[in-house]
């Protein structure tokens, strides 16, 4: 007789294979249609705690890369963690719409056509470009399973948003922190604009290492008591030598005259000997102050180069005499400022030498036509040749050099008139912005903790923030200035009127309207005596003021200010985290965030940066099509985001395997509780054991998730699922689930334990595997749903089963038993553990319910030691065990060797069938 039909086999419509690439888009479309985000807000409306992440806006340019996916998925997991743990959430996604990346793409698209277009038309093209990619990226983000207020995202190019960015600027100006001055700043000659520190990336670049001798003036020689001497400077930028105005010396170091007639810093003597520049013989030592105010002669143009003192002169390389061109370096600028030295700037916005060479006589007359209009980087070789014998030593070396983050061309320092936010003006209740920001960071929690040191160090050492740009696409620095005095006008009525115009017409109005149309009625200002500032704001000012325009304005349902969390890549310590901090501290003297979480960058399986040229780029859309978004989400959950995250096809296959284990565990649980109507309050020993293990594991996992330690939490969870749950308990329970009476006490007890674990498991993994949990709820029996219509009706409730079970002997004896069984199977002595009886001397084990112990070892019987013949024996401490061949017959229904007669049912199975 075939007894298969008498077994209570598992059944569920929750598929073994998820077919994720096909099913996920339809499931998200359903969420969208059902307005799940609104439902989530409503479900937690009465929650005492609400949590918001303020979205760091990506550029509305291009398709998403894997870094975007990592960032948005991690945000989504964290928000949903708070949600499924019973808290309210707010998440308004946003986009950075202005700036160079978009403007460059539009320039490429327009080509020569741009030259004949008005600024307004160019800006409209940029607006259209941004709008197109917002639509593209929004769909791509939503496909990642990310829930948020996608119907009302914030866009920095919205009229009202532009107005609020401008209002933030006005508030900074009113605080007295906004200054306009000529100062060297990072300049992208390729983009023809100033750059902020955050817009500069460092790459290796080959440059000249050049030692140049400047002959001392007669007065300087006389002061040293010599007839001839040369000050030797070192530079890596020969093209700046034409703009040299001074030579800086360290005020605290000794200097020396060598036998070669060279002046050097004494501490660098050995270094220069090793360089082959001097032989080491010193003729005279003197203090740097002896040369202060005297001069040397620039060998390129015969101009005086004054000796000045500066703390910026270090003894870690060069000669200790620093070539000082105040227009081409911040240290040079400040050192020269103290001495009233003129800033000369012979380089135009495109990086070409201009007519300043002629006006200031920076090169001999006969060379001017050759150099004016020449790109500075093409001038190095020509200038070195012109130096002749004054070039003491010339070589090349590779060093880290600043590059424009968008054009990927090397940048220069160039003095131009720009707008700055002052870091060291004591305008904030007697404190500087630098001091206020550093103080505010002390109340911010960082994940990982090292983040606070990193951003604090950057704040401590950063220069004033250059916020002006000479481009088209951005929010204008919309100030009027007096045409005669050039002084900016910060009249509150005027500023607020301009802001209101922007509210209605957008910031394009600054260019489209006449000055008279931009002034409020009743003003005493004469439009004919005013002019407009034409610079635009640094795009980091846009994103840095989003806390004000989104959280503080009341225009969005995005949660409160301060935000509970800012979450971006670790590069944002110098970018968005910092710009947001500075603007919030400038206006409100506090950080815009309560916590900051940073993640590393995505790299390939070998730890290499991804690039198209290497062919190692992995697009999130490709992962979604091949594996499903859920695999990408689990990859984020399994990865330690505090460092760089590796991703490759092999890694994704491993993640897919882990996902398969999770899915199959869920499927097994659902399939085996399909006929359970009520949770039993009676639990057997093994049920108590698994519930106690689940309580402990889930508590550890939930604590990890609450602390955003997802990798650690998932490792604990996966270990529990594979070892305790699937590896032991579910395997053990198959016999009672399939073969016991439908309403048998042991079967219902195990089903109840499984249902309890399944409910907790689903709500615990829902933040990460939302698609899967939603699918599971769709096909789950009512005992699991408990009224839930979808995953978003779930709330995680901690398990509280504190059964005191001393399982040390049980687990250690089971491990040893299984080791021996593996050998017996390998030697083909047995095929199954059901073929044996376990005998033991352990009173502790024998004191348990016999059926529970039989199932624990998955044998046909357990008894006291009585057999002389045995297949194997082992001991655990003082307890002895024997593995004995079963002495009864195999039951054709349950396969246990418990039948008294061959081909007969065992007593248990006979009893079950009798009652059917």
Swiss-Prot record:
Keywords: Aminoacyl-tRNA synthetase, ATP-binding, Cytoplasm, Ligase, Metal-binding, Nucleotide-binding, Protein biosynthesis, Zinc. GO terms for cellular component: cytosol. It is found in: Cytoplasm. Its EC number is 6.1.1.5. ATP binds at residue 612. InterPro entries: aa-tRNA-synth_I_CS, aa-tRNA-synth_Ia, Anticodon_Ile_BEm, Ile-tRNA-ligase, Ile-tRNA-ligase_type1, Ile-tRNA_ligase, M/V/L/I-tRNA-synth_anticd-bd, Rossmann-like_a/b/a_fold. This is Isoleucine--tRNA ligase. It comes from Campylobacter fetus subsp. fetus (strain 82-40).
């Amino acid at each position: 007789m075939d007894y298969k039909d008498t077994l209570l086999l598992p059944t569920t419509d929750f598929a073994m294979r998820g077919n994720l690439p096909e099913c996920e888009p339809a499931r998200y479309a359903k969420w969208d249609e059902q307005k799940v985000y609104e439902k989530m807000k409503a479900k937690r409306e009465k929650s005492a705690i609400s949590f918001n992440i303020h979205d760091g806006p990506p550029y509305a340019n291009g398709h998403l890369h894997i870094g975007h996916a990592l960032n948005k998925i991690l945000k989504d997991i964290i928000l949903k963690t708070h949600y499924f743990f019973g808290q309210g959430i707010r998440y308004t996604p946003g986009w950075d719409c202005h700036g160079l990346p978009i403007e460059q793409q539009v320039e490429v698209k327009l080509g020569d056509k741009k030259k004949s277009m008005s600024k307004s038309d160019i800006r409209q093209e940029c607006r259209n470009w941004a709008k197109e990619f917002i639509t593209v990226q929004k769909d791509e983000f939503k496909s990642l399973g990310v829930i948020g207020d996608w119907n009302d995202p914030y866009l920095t190019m919205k009229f009202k948003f532009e107005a609020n960015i401008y209002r933030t600027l006005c508030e900074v100006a009113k605080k007295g922190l906004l200054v306009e001055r000529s100062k060297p700043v990072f300049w992208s000659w390729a983009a023809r604009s100033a750059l902020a520190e955050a817009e500069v990336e460092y790459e290796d670049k080959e440059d000249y290492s050049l030692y140049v001798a400047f002959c001392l003036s007669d007065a300087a020689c006389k002061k040293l008591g010599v007839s001839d001497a040369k000050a030797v400077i070192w530079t890596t930028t020969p093209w700046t030598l034409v703009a040299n105005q001074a030579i800086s010396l360290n005020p605290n170091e000794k200097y020396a005259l060598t036998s070669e007639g060279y002046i050097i810093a004494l501490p660098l003597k050995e270094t220069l000997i090793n360089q082959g520049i001097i032989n080491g013989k010193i003729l005279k030592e003197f203090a740097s102050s002896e040369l202060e105010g005297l001069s040397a002669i620039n060998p390129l143009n015969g101009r005086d180069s004054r000796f000045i003192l500066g703390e910026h002169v270090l003894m870690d390389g060069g000669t200790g005499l620093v070539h000082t061109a105040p227009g081409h370096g911040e240290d040079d600028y400040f050192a020269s400022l103290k001495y009233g030295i003129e800033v000369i700037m012979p380089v135009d916005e495109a990086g070409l030498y201009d007519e300043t060479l002629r006006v200031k006589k920076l090169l001999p007359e006969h060379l001017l036509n050759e150099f004016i209009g020449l790109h500075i980087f093409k001038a190095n070789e020509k200038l070195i040749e012109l130096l002749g014998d004054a070039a003491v030593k010339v070589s090349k070396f590779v060093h880290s050099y600043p590059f424009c983050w968008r054009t990927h061309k090397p940048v220069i320092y160039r003095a131009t008139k720009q707008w700055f936010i002052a870091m060291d003006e004591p305008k904030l209740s007697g404190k500087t912005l630098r001091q206020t920001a550093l103080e505010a960071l002390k109340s911010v929690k960082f994940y990982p903790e090292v983040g606070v040191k990193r951003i604090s160090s950057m704040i401590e050492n950063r220069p004033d923030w250059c916020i002006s740009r000479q481009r088209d696409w951005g929010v204008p620095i919309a100030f009027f200035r007096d045409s005669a005095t050039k002084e900016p006008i910060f009249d509150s009525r005027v500023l607020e009127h301009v802001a209101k115009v922007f509210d209605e017409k957008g910031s394009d109005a600054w260019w489209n309207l006449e000055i008279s149309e931009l002034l409020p009625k009743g003003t005493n200002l004469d439009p004919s005596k005013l002019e407009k500032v034409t610079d635009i704001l640094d795009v980091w000012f846009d994103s840095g003021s989003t806390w004000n325009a989104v959280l503080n304005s009341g225009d969005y349902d995005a949660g409160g200010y301060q935000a509970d969390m800012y979450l971006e890549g670790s590069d944002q310590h110098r970018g968005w985290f910092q710009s947001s901090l500075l603007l919030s501290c400038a206006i409100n003297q506090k950080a815009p965030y309560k916590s900051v979480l940073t993640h590393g960058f995505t790299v390939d399986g070998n730890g290499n940066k991804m690039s198209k040229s290497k062919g190692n780029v992995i697009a999130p859309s490709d992962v979604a099509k091949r594996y499903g978004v859920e695999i990408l989400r689990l990859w984020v959950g399994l990865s330690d985001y505090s460092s760089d995250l590796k991703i490759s096809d092999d890694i994704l296959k491993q993640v897919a395997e882990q996902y398969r284990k999770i899915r199959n565990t869920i499927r097994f649980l659902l399939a085996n509780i399909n006929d359970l109507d009520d949770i039993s309050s009676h639990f057997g020993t093994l049920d108590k054991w698994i519930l106690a293990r689940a309580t402990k594991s889930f508590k550890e996992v939930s604590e990890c998730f609450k602390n955003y330690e997802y990798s650690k939490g998932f490792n604990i969870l996966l270990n529990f699922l594979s070892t305790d749950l699937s590896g032991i308990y579910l395997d053990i329970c198959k016999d009672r689930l399939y073969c016991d009476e439908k309403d048998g006490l042991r079967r219902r007890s195990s089903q109840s334990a499984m249902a309890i674990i399944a409910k907790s498991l689903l709500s615990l993994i829902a933040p990460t595997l939302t698609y899967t949990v939603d699918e599971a709820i769709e096909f789950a029996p009512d005992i699991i749903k408990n009224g839930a219509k979808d995953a978003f009706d779930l709330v995680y409730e901690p398990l509280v089963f504190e059964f005191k079970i001393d399982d040390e002997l049980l687990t250690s004896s089971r491990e040893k038993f299984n080791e021996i069984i593996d050998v017996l199977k390998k030697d083909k002595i047995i095929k199954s553990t059901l073929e044996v009886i376990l005998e033991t001397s352990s009173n502790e084990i024998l004191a348990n319910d016999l059926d529970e112990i039989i199932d624990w070892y998955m044998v046909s019987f357990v008894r006291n030691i009585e057999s002389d013949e045995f297949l194997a024996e082992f001991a655990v401490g003082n307890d002895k065990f024997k593995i004995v061949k079963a002495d009864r017959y195999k039951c054709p229904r349950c396969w246990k060797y418990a039948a008294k007669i061959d081909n007969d049912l065992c007593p248990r199975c006979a009893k079950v069938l009798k009652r059917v």
